[in-house]
């Protein structure tokens, strides 16, 4: 029977936490880049306030659906 020592469990926990932190940083960077692209689009297309709100609503729905498809609920 194979047993995992407390030290190994601690190492695995640290590695898991590091992976989570890196994933969160990556997600934040990708989201920031997405927002930058939206800002460029809004500026270039000279969207009205109503169009900007509609665009944000569509993006919100898209992210919501992505979260649902992954089983994530806030």
Swiss-Prot record:
Entries under Pfam families matching the protein: DUF2732 (PF10809)
Protein name: Uncharacterized 8.3 kDa protein in GpA 5'region
Gene name, Swiss-Prot/TrEMBL: ORF80
